[in-house]
Amino acid sequence: MIIGIGTDIVGIPRFQRHVDDPDSSLLRRIFTDQERSYCNARKSGAAACFAARFAAKESFLKALGTGLSDGISWHDMEVVNDELGKPELRLSRRAEELFRKKKGAGLFLSLSHDGGCAVAMVVLESL
């Protein structure tokens, strides 16, 4: 049974400014070391990569229905890719706890970017 759906769209230029600024703390605050390494390795596509991952985190928070309240940190949600490149959302700490509290059993993530925007959709499922 579906217990939550969230979607978010983000302007890629918003993240390009932070990719271009080595002193920007925003990327460290929102993204894990692994996420930053993955996106920065994309060179010209780094901003789109960061924007899509931010949209994924926002989409999860919308699907969960909490926003960043209730003790969830940006680092409690991490977008990783499987061996075929499929993006997955890895939860930890408070995000995982609240997901389980809602009887969450499955989490589905889709990412895309085009025309200066990145979009993500998250579907939460229970047994």
UniProtKB/Swiss-Prot annotation:
GO cellular component terms, semicolon-separated: cytoplasm
Cofactor annotation: Mg(2+)
Domain of life: Bacteria
Any one GO MF annotation of this record: magnesium ion binding
Residues binding Mg(2+), per UniProt: 8, 58
Listed name of the protein: Holo-[acyl-carrier-protein] synthase
Function comment: Transfers the 4'-phosphopantetheine moiety from coenzyme A to a Ser of acyl-carrier-protein.
EC number: 2.7.8.7
Key words of the record: Cytoplasm, Fatty acid biosynthesis, Fatty acid metabolism, Lipid biosynthesis, Lipid metabolism, Magnesium, Metal-binding, Transferase
NCBIfam families the UniProt entry points to: acpS (TIGR00516), pantethn_trn (TIGR00556), PRK00070.3-2 (NF000832), PRK14656.1 (NF011250)
Gene Ontology BP, a term: fatty acid biosynthetic process
Residue stretches in coiled coil: none
Pfam families to which the protein is assigned, alphabetical: ACPS
